[in-house]
């Protein structure tokens, strides 16, 4: 007799809390009372776990509580809101999945909360009990209800693979779903030139017969026969240019399409769409900071993003040229990096309208000024103050792009909050495929900056920024991130995008469904380092030895100037090296302090940091000024002279590359101690140069580095442990010099496998093709979302932007 499996309902969080109350009543009351005793406020995960551990110390019988279902709840809780006698807990069983529960500690009652109810309760921390039951809520879930999406957390960030499976499955099940592909190929033109198909092919059946006829003709030709020699025959059959430059490539492309028409599969569909000629003109938005090629790195708001984009466009132009040639076309690609023109350019080229990017032929920086009713803004302003200028900037940029390209771009890429908002405005206006790259979403960098947004408003204007981020990420056709963590965090930490799923700005609006991290628009595409500048220290023939004298002066000079202070007395010691902007999040002063406090580390190694200004009078950045003052205080307090060298921000990338290698010659290490790092370009640079790397476990570096194999993870919130890890490494290297080589080689292997610009550019171009097709197929469904976002922009964002004081100058 066969038995059928018995299915049981997975208990909700509420059920598990209720069951725990029944089984461990006294222990749970003791724990919850401890939470309530801390008073009104927000408890972080470590607070919740610490109190659970504390009651274990009092009574070992409570071990069952910790190891049981309630212990699992506490370990997956991201925060708890305490408003005595209530404790509301936000539980995240796995990335992207949330539940909310509230316990009345006095009455021992438990209730499950909706997102809206939880956020309403949280708002009472700031607003008190509100009588207003009608609050503006942003909810994008209804617009996405019919959209396909994966359900497993492991699928997050692999959006294009899921989309290809969905599209090919639909085509396989329903041949009518092939019609949009035919229409897509038929409407393909560029500046009046028909591409792919002409009007002779009006149906799928005619397409199939034309492909078979073309296949028969092409198979008789030599594989390297140029397209021009058989162009006329193909045109008469219904085919235009774009299939390939030789008979072999055209035949391969046509075989791909025949396979799709006969039995679609995800891999074939992606390969085909990736090769269809779609992208000839690209616009990349990056308005804030000093965007230039020389003398800008280290200036306020100017760092890794500039390096990222300049490396990106070089790789992208190269990939576009290769693809256009292989497609049998003779079009000239154009890439425009659109940024702000700054008349008072501080000795940079940021006051020039057009500047060709070195190492490219067809890529330029196009600068457009910020302007208001008072005229053109001449001076730099903080990225936090740009909001009143962006709408007018977008209008001016549209005109400048049209003049420069003589057409609309095919693809727009936004960078950071301001660039992504401008990209959204342009893509919406032009009907162009839009890609979003956040680099860093500020909401995760400043804890509780949503619930207590009013405290941050005068300095940071986060109400504008968070609103702009929501609009841009939902308007984008696809989003690329450098790491999984940017999207959905880790088992225990929230991702940058995930933090925008549900949050509240009390008194402004409440987000009950801001973004879905399972959305197939998310893709992980990791950048690399420019390998003409960053290459292994062991590559002796390429080493820039002519720079060694200037590097020695930087590191070992005794002169105290505005460019460098401190000194290194013992040149035989390895060097710990760090290079970053001098702000709170980058935590350079934290590294200096942990080094200063560890006498064993000071005995083993020297410390060199390249960061910001040394003279506080030279900085106009609020955070940098505080960090400069702190650095000077640390030098005096711990008497670091002789073991520590502080060098101002260096803008010569070639010398910076050789600086990494010079540090490697000392058998030193690179340390990236940030409290949070979205990706970690300097980590990739250091590893590419063969320098053993220690980097924050909060953010991207945790994915780049395999702990103990290709580098080491450090926790900036536990600096003593981080410094001991460094002591252990250098002590082992002293005893076994091969240990240093092993870690160095492990880092290089990791880079070559995952983090190169060639891999990046190939992937980005393929994504542009697939999502352009998806945009064409799903245009009706996306239209509702965009109209909703447009209303939110006009009715909410505009007022917020207009409330930001207009910068003078």
Curated annotation (Swiss-Prot):
PANTHER family, per the entry: PTHR45839, SUCROSE SYNTHASE
Keywords: Glycosyltransferase, Transferase
Pfam families from the UniProt entry: Glycos_transf_1 (PF00534), GT-B_Sucrose_synth (PF00862), SUS_EPBD (PF24862), SUS_N (PF24861)
Documented EC number(s): 2.4.1.13
Chain ranges passing through the membrane: none
Gene3D superfamilies (UniProt xref): 1.20.120.1230, 3.10.450.330, Glycogen Phosphorylase B
Entries under SUPFAM superfamilies matching the protein: UDP-Glycosyltransferase/glycogen phosphorylase (SSF53756)
GO-annotated biological processes: sucrose metabolic process
Catalytic activity: an NDP-alpha-D-glucose + D-fructose = a ribonucleoside 5'-diphosphate + sucrose + H(+)
Similarity remark: Belongs to the glycosyltransferase 1 family. Plant sucrose synthase subfamily.
Family matches, as InterPro entries: Glyco_trans_1, Sucrose_synth_GT-B1, Sucrose_synthase_pln/cyn, SUS_EPBD, SUS_N
Function field: Sucrose-cleaving enzyme that provides UDP-glucose and fructose for various metabolic pathways.
Domain of life, per lineage: Eukaryota
Protein name: Sucrose synthase 2
Lineage: Eukaryota, Viridiplantae, Streptophyta, Embryophyta, Tracheophyta
Sample GO molecular function, one term: sucrose synthase activity
Disulphide bond pairs: none
UniProt region (GT-B glycosyltransferase), positions on chain: 278-756
